[in-house]
């Protein structure tokens, strides 16, 4: 339910931006301001200020966070521009091809090896881009820019996780990223006001209320996403991510009435085939891992298998995980919980427990 809530709220964002009668720069600037406000409020509730102090004390971490905030701001601006100029379908296309772009970047940057179905999905996605380019006479630059910026943002966040001594967490991370964007956002607001182009505050209470809602819809889905990631397998979270572009497609085509000529239908259909191949690869990979867990190989030259050894080792009492000495300590270190992993081996062995970051 948390994953559905997160991606469902992200899917509804175009409806909010459509009703805001302001330019993309103003919407982005006000969204950053309200996002900072709500993130600081959440930080006060969860009490993880020590995470922020540790992050800003490291030059490397600050550098990666600055790059992440720049990419996030670019993605936000492109999305707002798309939704306020009648191009919601292009935004939807961007998030359909984003997983494929992420996989492609993992090959180019991280030198990872892809499975056959992943290459097939990327090839089909590239064919969709070619079809749309031929049909419209130009590359779908907005969709590609959104997908690429978000994919690079994911790589930067992955690198950022390796540069910190402990996980930064979703809320502290977003707080710092929006804080880095706060000064440019305030400068943009002042310049718009000086030129007489600032709409916020000049048309009554409705527009500021809607703009405040952008801050809520920035922070709340992130909380839901973090809750989902700590409760369900990551592969399931990856499946749920398509709720957002599907919802945006329905809003763009069915609610806002954006045109869908045959060439665009063909391009989207090819992208959907690529997505299905990608999902199929994830499902097959998950099944292979499950099959490997079910296999009980025997030790070489003996009749004893690995789970017998596991039973012997895990039957001994293990020391409990450290408990928080106080509520303040618990708030600072975040939520560590014991969670069972693997399966009971059926031979008297205990299922091991690990500490999971929530």
Q: Which ranges hold each PLM region?
A:
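Hydrophobic alpha-helical transmembrane segments of multi-pass integral membrane proteins
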Residues: 1, 27-44, 164-218
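Glycine-/small-residue-enriched transmembrane alpha-helix faces in small-molecule transporters
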Residues: 1-29, 123, 127-162, 291-309, ...
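Loop-to-transmembrane-helix transition segments
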Residues: 1-6, 51-78, 141-145, 198-220, ...
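Membrane-interface helix termini and inter-helical loops of multi-pass transporters
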Residues: 15-23, 52, 84-87, 130, ...
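C-terminal-most transmembrane helix of multi-pass membrane proteins
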Residues: 32, 134, 139, 242-330, ...
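Helix-helix packing/entry segments at the starts of transmembrane helices
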Residues: 93-97, 164-180, 219-254
């Amino acid at each position: 339910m948390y994953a559905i809530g997160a991606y469902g709220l992200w899917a509804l964002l175009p409806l909010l931006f459509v009703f805001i009668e302001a330019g993309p720069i103003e919407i982005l600037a006000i969204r950053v301001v309200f996002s900072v406000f709500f993130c600081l409020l959440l930080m006060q509730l969860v009490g993880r200020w020590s995470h922020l102090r540790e992050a800003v004390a490291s030059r490397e971490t600050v550098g990666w966070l600055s790059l992440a905030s720049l990419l996030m701001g670019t993605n936000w601006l492109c999305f707002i521009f798309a939704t306020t100029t009648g191009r919601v379908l292009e935004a939807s296309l961007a998030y359909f091809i984003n997983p494929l772009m992420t996989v492609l970047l993992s090959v180019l940057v991280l030198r990872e090896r892809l499975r056959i179905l992943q290459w097939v999905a990327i090839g089909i996605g590239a064919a969709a881009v070619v079809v749309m380019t031929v049909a419209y006479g130009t590359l779908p630059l907005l969709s590609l820019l959104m997908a690429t910026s978000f994919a690079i943002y994911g790589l930067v966040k992955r690198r950022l996780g390796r540069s910190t001594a402990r996980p930064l967490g979703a809320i502290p991370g977003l707080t710092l990223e929006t804080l880095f964007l706060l000064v440019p956002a305030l400068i943009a607001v002042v310049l718009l006001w000086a030129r007489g182009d600032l709409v916020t505050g000049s048309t009554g209470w409705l527009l500021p209320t809607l703009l405040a809602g952008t801050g809520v819809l920035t922070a709340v889905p992130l909380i839901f996403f973090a809750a989902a990631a700590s409760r369900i397998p990551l592969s399931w979270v990856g499946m749920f991510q398509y709720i957002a572009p599907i919802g945006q497609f329905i809003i763009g085509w069915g609610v806002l009435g954006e045109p869908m000529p045959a060439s665009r239908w063909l391009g989207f259909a090819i992208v959907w085939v690529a997505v299905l191949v990608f999902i199929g690869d994830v499902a097959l990979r998950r099944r292979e891992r499950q099959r490997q867990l079910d296999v009980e190989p025997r030790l070489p030259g003996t009749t004893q298998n690995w789970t017998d050894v596991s039973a012997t080792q895990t039957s001994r009492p293990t020391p409990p995980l450290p408990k928080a000495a106080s509520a303040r300590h618990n708030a600072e270190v975040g939520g560590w919980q014991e969670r069972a992993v693997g399966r009971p081996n059926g031979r008297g062995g205990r299922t091991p427990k690990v500490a999971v970051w929530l």
